[in-house]
Structures are given as C-alpha cells and as structure tokens.
C-alpha cells in the first residue's frame, strides 16, 4: 500500500511544474472575457437610429460628411485618404491626420472592412466605421493592435489617383 501511495505522490509531484507553468502564463487583454465583452458591446451600442448601417461581416458604417454622389472607388483602385484609427476606449493607434499627411493605398491591400466601406464613399465624403476583429486584424492582431480588437475609424476619401 505504501508503494501505491509513493507512486501516486510521484505522479502528482511530477505534474506540478506543468501546472505551475500553465498558471504563470500571462493572460493578455485579448484573452480576457471582460475585454472581449467590451469589444462586442462597442459594436452593439451603434444603432440604425444614429445613422449606422450594416455591411458584410458585421462592419458598421455611417456617412458623416458628403452626399455619396460622384466618383466611387472599386477594389482595383488606389485611394488617397485621411483616416484616424482608435480603439473602443478612444486611444489612437494610427492617424494620417496626426501626421498631417494623407495616405495613398491600393484598396485591395487594406483590411476587409475598408474594402467594403471605402467603395460606399464618393470623393469628398467622410465616414465612420466600427470594425469587428474578424474584419480587421483577426484573433492575432498586428503591431499595436491586439488580437480580437474592435476598431473604430474615421475615413475621408480625398482622391482616386488610379483614375
């Protein structure tokens, strides 16, 4: 009987380093349930009565300036725009406005949310979009953007230089 007890203790003791290392792994913000709930709540708080419309994949958008009439880009176009990207808490992660320099990008090379929203714009329009993680940088993230982050953008279409 003592041999069984010693064997059982040996098994438990040998597993302790594995359990300790699993518990010591830091939980990043994208792994926290409360953080994920806040990301979803930010999307749910935007209402149609406030001018928000739905696009594919749960992307929300609204026009804040302009009429939507005039030349519109397609996925094959290059676009020049000003933009500001923030997290749901308002913290800025990127802004061409801050740099005081518009950005020019091939539309097809941008995140899926932008590929859907920017073609809804005419030159001179400004929109806001709320981007669920799946339509932005996904579960892994990129640079300062953590995986699972809902992103908010203000986008102003200045030109379609590819035309």
Regions found by a protein language model. Give the residues of each.
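Cross-family detector of peptidyl-prolyl cis-trans isomerase
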Residues: 2-9, 13, 18-163
């Amino acid at each position: 009987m003592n041999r069984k007890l010693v064997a059982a203790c040996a098994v438990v003791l040998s597993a302790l380093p594995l359990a300790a290392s699993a518990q010591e792994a830091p939980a990043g913000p994208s792994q926290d349930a409360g953080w994920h709930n806040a990301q979803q709540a930010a999307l749910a708080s935007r209402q149609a009565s406030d001018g928000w419309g739905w696009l594919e994949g749960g992307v929300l958008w609204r026009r804040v300036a302009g009429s939507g009439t005039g030349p519109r880009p397609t996925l094959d176009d290059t676009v020049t725009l000003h933009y500001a990207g923030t997290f749901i808490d308002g913290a800025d992660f990127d802004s061409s406005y801050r740099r005081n320099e518009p950005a020019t990008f091939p539309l097809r090379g941008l995140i899926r949310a932008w590929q859907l929203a920017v073609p809804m714009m005419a030159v001179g329009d400004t929109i806001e979009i709320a981007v669920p993680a799946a339509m932005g940088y996904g579960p892994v993230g990129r640079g300062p953007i953590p995986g699972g982050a809902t992103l908010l953008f203000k986008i102003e279409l200045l030109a379609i230089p590819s035309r």
